[in-house]
Amino acid sequence: MNNDKRPLYIPFAGPALLSTPLLNKGSAFSAEERISFNLEGLLPETTETIQEQVERAYMQYKAFESDMDKHIYLRNIQDTNETLFYRLVQNHITEMMPIIYTPTVGAACENFSNIYRRGRGLFVSYANRDRIDDILNNASNHNVKVIVVTDGERILGLGDQGIGGMGIPIGKLSLYTACGGISPAYTLPIVLDVGTNNPQRLADPMYMGWRHPRITGADYDAFVEEFIQAVQRRWPDALIQFEDFAQKNAMPLLERYKNRICCFNDDIQGTAAVTVGSLMAACQAAGSKLSEQRITFLGAGSAGCGIAEAIIAQMVSEGISDKKARSQVFMVDRWGLLQEGMPNLLDFQQRLVQKHSVTAKWETEANGFSLLDVVKNAKPTVLIGVSGAPGLFTQEVIQEMHKHCPRPIVFPLSNPTSRVEAVPADIIRWTNGDALVATGSPFDPVIHEGKTYPIVQCNNSYIFPGIGLGVLAVNAKRVTDEMLMESSRALATCSPLAINGKGALLPPLEEIHTVSKRIAYAVAKKAIEQGVALEIADDALQVAIEQHFWQPVYRRYKRTAF
């Protein structure tokens, strides 16, 4: 654990020091520091510990009634005193994660311009495309190692939010630090402002982004390319996480850059990794393998197809053929089951179509096969929702699945809560408590006939902080598919249900540091094995992970000149 006792030498003093969130201690500055840094009279007389500050901050937090007000309050602390912010969040991680990230962050993105207080990260506008290098040089953090970037076009299940999408990179990087121990000094949220096609945003006098229809096609690609090249010039070793890009751009960008730079797409690969890890744990708890499951997806976009491909890869690693694995995965979108010969399918969807030979004897009352048709005929053991369309896991669908599967695995993963395919209480009730449920957004435990059923949040926060920590620990040059698969396997080994046969599918968030370190070790080991990181011994790797794991504690300050 990186708990360095050495002093930090700081060139700032007075109001400038108090206005620097990474360095500000507020009332915790010692008497000696107050003299050295010209802070006397700028703070109340009492010197407090960080725990005393946390207690006051938590009291203030509890005084707010709405989740949005709580979100704004926490963001204000983050922009004032980052060490205090992360200590507060770590002390109350289960309570506050839904406030700093999903589901509350969705509303914060929709209202970004209305609740704006202070700039954070970088806004890289298409209008300023000739000055991207200068913009990157303006970043307040100089030693950047992790970047989360969005263009705001597909924010959660809420669509095009323009620069309002900045709330997602800010929230994601908060979790890199709170869950994965990555110092906030190493992080940078970025939004690529290429305009918006959201008429509400364009008509809103408060909207702060570039008022222009979205740039598309070759102009868009050239802009992203110039941005990537500028990042490579400024921070050549930084990990870039692509976040909430629209389907038409997400997969092409990933394919274009994954073998050129150290990057991944959390919506596609992070969601896939946490889902595969959760499914592996569920299968282990049931004494079966993932390769023995029949899996139906509702939602065949880049996220759904990314999960499907990761599941297929794990099935193949368990010993079945790629052809056999694909025959057990059924993708359903708004037009029904994806089948060979369907028009207008994207390349990544084409790889997941079902053969007519599989569906030739299926029964249906209409052209094509609906979700209910697929459940009746394919008889899935796993049902995964990534559609962003609420309520489509109906009672009829769930109970039809339950007819032929005594322990159905149901993952309605769409975010935010308002977009979930079915609420856990209904799924538990419809299956008389037999279903194993995990969701994308947080839900309270369900009580059914006197028994309590914990509802696990199958959230990417179990995965991406550990991936980032592993990449940083060995300075990996790429994020490979095999590294992501190792993250899934490491997560599965943390499952209380798989280990003990009881309890929740995933560990509680209070254990997220242990989970992230285990994932980091597995990811880093695979990076070394694949030659995308320098080789180090296992014990040295453990030390490197601990040394990179930042904790929110105040360091002693000594004054120095610029």
Curated annotation (Swiss-Prot):
Q: Which SUPFAM superfamilies match?
A: Aminoacid dehydrogenase-like, N-terminal domain, NAD(P)-binding Rossmann-fold domains
Where, by residue number, is the active site? Y101 (proton donor), K172 (proton acceptor)
Q: Which UniProt keywords apply?
A: Metal-binding, NAD, Oxidoreductase
| Statement: the UniProt record of this protein carries the keyword Magnesium | no
Cofactor requirements of the protein:
Mg(2+); Mn(2+)
Q: Indicate the enzyme's highest-level EC class.
A: oxidoreductase
Give binding positions for NAD(+).
Answer: R154, D267, N415
Q: Which GO terms describe its biological process?
A: malate metabolic process
Copy out the cofactor comment: Divalent metal cations. Prefers magnesium or manganese.
Q: Origin, by domain of life?
A: Bacteria
Q: Where does a divalent metal cation bind?
A: E243, D244, D267
Record-level Gene Ontology MF annotations: malate dehydrogenase (decarboxylating) (NAD+) activity; metal ion binding; NAD binding; oxaloacetate decarboxylase activity
According to UniProt, residues marked as the site described as Important for activity are D267
Q: What catalytic activity is recorded? A: (S)-malate + NAD(+) = pyruvate + CO2 + NADH; oxaloacetate + H(+) = pyruvate + CO2
A single GO cellular-component term on record: cytosol
What's the Enzyme Commission number for this chain? 1.1.1.38
HAMAP family named in the record: NAD_malic_enz
Question: Its quaternary structure?
Answer: Homotetramer.
Give the protein's recorded name: NAD-dependent malic enzyme 1
Q: Which organism is it from?
A: Vibrio vulnificus (strain YJ016)
- What does the organism's lineage look like at the top? Bacteria, Pseudomonadati, Pseudomonadota, Gammaproteobacteria, Vibrionales
